[in-house]
């Protein structure tokens, strides 16, 4: 996710979606609860959604083999990262990757779940070309994590809690490729056997907005604690969604599963689309069939994939090749201590400690390295016995200018800029000092900041400014002469200004900045302009 998108998602309150077609739906809130209103009949319906998120564990090797976990890395030859275990060669036995266990524990602790000290692995049987074993190793009876919750903040300020049922460890499948041969489907097993955390929610969602918020928040949490890269565009985080609708105060409807959603936008759109389909069927006295469906992003409609299997169809039984997974309480406590500050705890602290707005704090915690840089800038200032810095100016540089530069240069990781010494805390605070001292204007400061970020010149901010002659002009006599001459040379604009056309004032400011190449002190120019324009008032 790029940095401008992070800002836009927060500005737009994250994925809020209302369908407005003639046979569509409208989100409504009644007594602090979300409902759907049919635009065709004006009847009120309740939407119920549950989500299964499959997030690849961030580990060097796969779940049960020593094959490289390629994750989102591109460029690997098909079937080049496959062991005998991954390909299900007879006699090849699985060996559990302990790092996958650690990542699942971290995830469970971060959502307030209970770590199951005794968990087991089961075999889930089904036949598909990219599942060479004929079964998936998963955890049905005793998953590694039980319980937990995630708090959502909705667009209208309401809080909504999503309960987590459990998290289970399981294998990812391979990939079926259908577009490389005109008559054959090909199989790539590089992904087969990568560790997955299946994070299963309760059916606590009652709007597509809640789902969008949840996906974004869970994705951010997994990245923050380092248990998964969770990049949906690379398939590192995929979602299955269960949807049903019913009239308020009646029994839940028949649920339909939407399979393998790989973008938050698609998930939200598919929920609205499927809700419309189900409501339309029910309003026409038809029944909902229990099935698995896909979503066509081009048409915006869901489509039938297959009849939904029951649990008995998978013939679950304990995996005889894997012993019980036993986790000591000491290990759980050690991992808990290593977790560090979680995003929501950080947000609350930033608001309290620095008097930040909810909006600014939310933006900062989107990237842990940005938040750390913000705090280090303040600490650096305090350690050098300087006066309290204007926090808003730091935020403007970080959340507006630096985010803008990162986005325009297609850089996803702010931390890489720091690691490559393009932007140090010292340079950043020096630049802020020069602006506060009036040595340069904010606009020139932005120019210098971008030069530093580009990494082409390692000189200090002041040396960069002086070498280009960009220091601010604060000479009263020089600016007085420029302003007086400008006003004298533009009598028509002066008349328009006194007729109430305030845009003309911007014209005068712009002309002065143009003549001084943006270096004139705006405060001095502003005072001089008012002085000479008032003198011309008849």
Swiss-Prot record:
Q: What does this protein do?
A: Allows the formation of correctly charged Gln-tRNA(Gln) through the transamidation of misacylated Glu-tRNA(Gln) in the mitochondria. The reaction takes place in the presence of glutamine and ATP through an activated gamma-phospho-Glu-tRNA(Gln).
Q: How does it assemble?
A: Subunit of the heterotrimeric GatCAB amidotransferase (AdT) complex, composed of A, B and C subunits.
Chief place of localization: mitochondrion
**Top-level class of the enzyme under EC nomenclature:** ligase
The cross-references to Pfam families, in alphabetical order and at most eight, read:
GatB_N (PF02934), GatB_Yqey (PF02637)
| UniProt keyword list | ATP-binding, Ligase, Mitochondrion, Nucleotide-binding, Protein biosynthesis
**NCBIfam families of this UniProt entry?**
gatB, PRK05477.1-2, PRK05477.1-4
Q: Which GO terms describe its molecular function?
A: ATP binding; glutaminyl-tRNA synthase (glutamine-hydrolyzing) activity
GO annotation, biological process: glutaminyl-tRNAGln biosynthesis via transamidation; mitochondrial translation
User: Where found in the cell?
Assistant: Mitochondrion
Name of the featured protein: Glutamyl-tRNA(Gln) amidotransferase subunit B, mitochondrial
* InterPro entries, alphabetized: Asn/Gln-tRNA_amidoTrfase_suB/E, Asn/Gln-tRNA_Trfase_suB/E_cat, Asn/Gln_amidotransferase, Asn/Gln_tRNA_amidoTrase-B-like, GatB, GatB_Yqey_C_2, Gln-tRNA_amidoTrfase_suB_CS, Gln_synth/guanido_kin_cat_dom
Q: What is its EC number?
A: 6.3.5.-
This protein's superkingdom?
Eukaryota
Q: Which GO terms describe its cellular component?
A: glutamyl-tRNA(Gln) amidotransferase complex; mitochondrion
Q: Taxonomic lineage of this organism?
A: Eukaryota, Amoebozoa, Evosea, Eumycetozoa, Dictyostelia
Name the PROSITE patterns on file: GATB
